[in-house]
Design a protein with these regions (language model features):
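N-terminal amphipathic/basic leader segments beginning at the initiator methionine
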Residues: 1-43
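Glycine-rich phosphate/diphosphate-binding loops that line cofactor/substrate pockets in enzymes
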Residues: 49-65, 90-96, 230
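Short glycine-rich or small-residue beta-strand-to-loop segments that form or flank ligand, phosphate
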Residues: 63-74, 99-105
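Histidine-anchored nucleotide/phosphate-binding helix
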Residues: 73-93
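"Short basic amphipathic alpha-helical interaction patches in structured regions
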Residues: 78-85, 114-118, 178-183
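Acidic low-complexity segments
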Residues: 96-146
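Conserved, well-structured core segments that form the ligand-binding/active-site neighborhood
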Residues: 126-146, 150-262
Length: 262
């Protein structure tokens, strides 16, 4: 079996593996891309899964934080975030009350050039965009322990916000079952010890197929509880087809909409 891996921005590497060495395959299905994804986001925000329309969920004085992924993920933030900003403005929330926090986990900080490429010039000019800092305690808030003994410290900007929106992508994940949903918070905007211990605990599960591609598992349940405690109120998740084109948006309650997207 040939395995094609992305290498850099435009290249790929092909690995040939014997079929007997393939234990299982977790991949995205074939689905047609959306014809007008921007309009689909607007529709979904007007009728999110399990929630009232976004314009009814926020108040004009609210401090809103949008938590989005970094450039190691394919989520089209430059498409999604401008629509969110417009919807929040329509609800009375000015750009000055909105921040974007990039959920780096323990990844390196994105440069200004990379942020503009990922989020677009419009978003960069309209709102403050902050790289999550997993190392310095003054930028984190201790919110207690997860059930399996993991100390949880989250980004202070996120925790202190009145309304938190997570923007990510639903895809099979080896340690969480699926990426997306509350994973943008836990471990996305947690401290380095929280991130390390989360990966360590998940990596001890054997066989790997108990987690990867499984909707209901212990790690996902912890993710959901911590994300709720950190204040995640709404998710906008993409579902991409095998060509990385948007085939669906899962928008709404962080658990209900995530499950609908999976």
């Amino acid at each position: 079996m040939d395995i094609v891996l992305p290498y850099g921005k435009e290249k790929t590497i092909t690995l040939a593996l014997p079929d007997e060495n393939i234990f299982f395959i977790a991949d995205r299905g074939h689905a047609p891309p959306l014809e007008n994804p921007r309009e689909e986001i607007k529709k979904a925000l007007g009728k999110p899964v399990g929630l009232d329309p976004l314009r009814k969920l926020v108040k004009a004085r609210d401090r809103v934080v949008i938590v989005g992924d970094d450039n190691t993920r394919p989520t089209p933030q430059s498409l999604i975030v401008p629509v969110l900003l417009d919807e929040l403005n329509a609800a009375g929330v000015p750009d000055g009350n909105i921040k974007v926090v990039i959920a780096l986990g323990t990844h390196r900080k994105m440069s200004e050039k990379e942020i503009k490429e990922k989020y677009g010039e419009e978003v960069f000019k309209r709102v403050a965009i902050i790289n999550h800092d997993c190392k310095h305690p003054e930028n984190l808030v201790d919110i207690g322990m997860a059930e399996i003994g993991i100390p949880v410290r989250v980004n202070k900007e996120v925790y202190n916000a009145d309304f938190v929106i997570g923007v990510g992508n639903i895809v099979p994940h080896p340690l969480a079952g699926w990426g997306g949903g509350g994973k943008i918070i836990f471990p996305g905007v947690c401290d380095e010890k929280t991130v390390a211990m989360t990966h360590f605990v998940a990596s001890k599960v054997r066989p790997l197929s108990k987690l990867m591609g499984r909707l209901d598992n212990e790690i996902r349940r912890i993710i959901d509880r911590v994300a709720a405690k950190a204040g995640l109120k709404l998710i906008v998740n993409t579902v991409l087809n095998q060509e990385d084109k948007i085939s669906h948006f899962a928008v709404g309650h962080p658990i209900t909409a995530f499950k609908e997207g999976v």
